[in-house]
Amino acid sequence: MTTFVDRVELHAAAGNGGHGCASVHREKFKPLGGPDGGNGGRGGDVILVVEQSVTTLLDYHHSPHRKATNGQPGAGDNRSGKDGQDLVLPVPDGTVVLDKAGNVLADLVGQGTTFVAGQGGRGGLGNAALASARRKAPGFALLGEPGESRDIVLELKTVADVALVGYPSAGKSSLISVLSAAKPKIADYPFTTLVPNLGVVTAGSTVYTIADVPGLIPGASQGKGLGLEFLRHVERCSVLVHVLDTATLESDRDPVSDLDMIEEELRLYGGLENRPRIVALNKVDIPDGQDLADMIRPDLEARGYRVFEVSAIAHKGLKELSFALAGIIAEARATKPKEEATRIVIRPRAVDDAGFTVTLEDDGIYRVRGEKPERWVRQTDFNNDEAVGYLADRLNRLGVEDSLMKAGARAGDGVAIGPEENAVVFDWEPTVTAGAEMLGRRGEDHRLEEPRPAAQRRRERDAERDDAEKEYDEFDPF
């Protein structure tokens, strides 16, 4: 059964915003209570958060579809809907977020670093929030916006200070098991290690992590063997340790040629040219291994490598190797800027962006694109004529009508607002020609202006009663 996964495809869907409420206040003896519809709640975000306790992407391999909760709709009596709950997804330190095309969206390094994979939709305004001096009792509310949906790829690049690289069965797993408390699978056949193993090493006052990367073979940079699956795990390491087998039984191999092959694969993979290298000649506890190590050590040192003769079985040379690595890591940490937890958002919301474009397409449709027009369309209930009129007013104030006229649009031409796959298309009627039908001051409560016969009769009765009482008081028979 799979227990380690370092690459998954994830579908993240944020919550939709709740719809606003169109409601009129109802209370005894208050016939004109006014609008009291509450706003809809915000949809929940989908957030990736780095957690040090998480070491694999296995959970998302089994369950790749994740959705945050929706915001609740508003209600009467000025009650706003509850916001949707954010969906927080823990990921390992070193997770890289990519889009489907392979472009890097975020590199999540450091405990607490967050990435907003999908933003929840805004809640719609209720009619109480839409009321104004001219629109005293709106008979509509705004719809909640849909949350963002995005397909992303998560790749784990192990965050370790040291990477052990080498041929299969060179003794990397044995070496990490004696340098640290790691318990990797160890056997005498190639590709025993199928996933990176991490261990923690303490050398004096320096504590660092070491990674045992699965064995590399010729063609690894092109994906041969376990190749590209695990080469990315060495990208973040401060130092590379070439583990060379001095007791190999294969006649066509020797430690120097193994080193040259691994270096060529690292060169082809790219990005590791300036990384410090150390050579660990392993298995020198075997007599033939010690003899071969003595032969090739001068050649390796002449190339500029620091060479250590080690044996995982006999525990030879381990202290010297661990302290040498600690020195290199301490220098690297001193020059590396401190990484702090950050919050990464793919596309921040444009708060004051009033920009939009109008283009004439080949099919004769005038297409309007812009953050505000598209958002307003998503918020409009097209089954409500008053809401549609409110949208027309907003677009006119933004300058969309003027831009359509300048672009050559005439009454009856088709206008589309939004992208091709999700646009609202309608026949345009300029406000100048349609104004006679739209001058009713939308949202106005005509009950405030029109005479009410019942109230008038009540006032007349009160006046007659007052007159009768006055006449009675003035009457004096004596």
Curated annotation (Swiss-Prot):
It is found in: Cytoplasm. Residues 61-87, 436-478 are annotated as: Disordered. Gene3D superfamilies: GTP-binding protein OBG, C-terminal domain, GTP1/OBG domain, P-loop containing nucleotide triphosphate hydrolases. Its EC number is 3.6.5.-. Its main location: cytoplasm. Its cofactor is Mg(2+). GO terms for cellular component: cytoplasm. Residues 469-478 have a biased composition (Acidic residues). GO terms for biological process: ribosome biogenesis. Residues 2-159 form the Obg domain. Keywords: Cytoplasm, GTP-binding, Hydrolase, Magnesium, Metal-binding, Nucleotide-binding. GO terms for molecular function: GTP binding; GTPase activity; magnesium ion binding. It comes from the Bacteria. Residues 160-330 form the OBG-type G domain. Pfam families: DUF1967 (PF09269), GTP1_OBG (PF01018), MMR_HSR1 (PF01926). GTP binds at residues 166-173, 191-195, 212-215, 282-285, 311-313. Mg(2+) binds at residues 173, 193. Residues 348-430 form the OCT domain. InterPro entries: G_OBG (IPR031167), GTP-bd (IPR006073), GTP-bd_Obg/CgtA (IPR014100), GTP-bd_prot_GTP1/OBG_C_sf (IPR036346), GTP1-OBG_CS (IPR006074), GTP1_OBG_dom (IPR006169), GTP1_OBG_dom_sf (IPR036726), OBG_GTPase (IPR045086). Residues 439-468 have a biased composition (Basic and acidic residues). Monomer. Belongs to the TRAFAC class OBG-HflX-like GTPase superfamily. OBG GTPase family. Overexpression suppresses sporulation although cell growth rate was not reduced. Impaired differentiation was eliminated by addition of decoyinine, an inhibitor of GMP synthesis. Overexpression has no effect on streptomycin production. An essential GTPase which binds GTP, GDP and possibly (p)ppGpp with moderate affinity, with high nucleotide exchange rates and a fairly low GTP hydrolysis rate. Plays a role in control of the cell cycle, stress response, ribosome biogenesis and in those bacteria that undergo differentiation, in morphogenesis control. This is GTPase Obg. It comes from Streptomyces griseus.
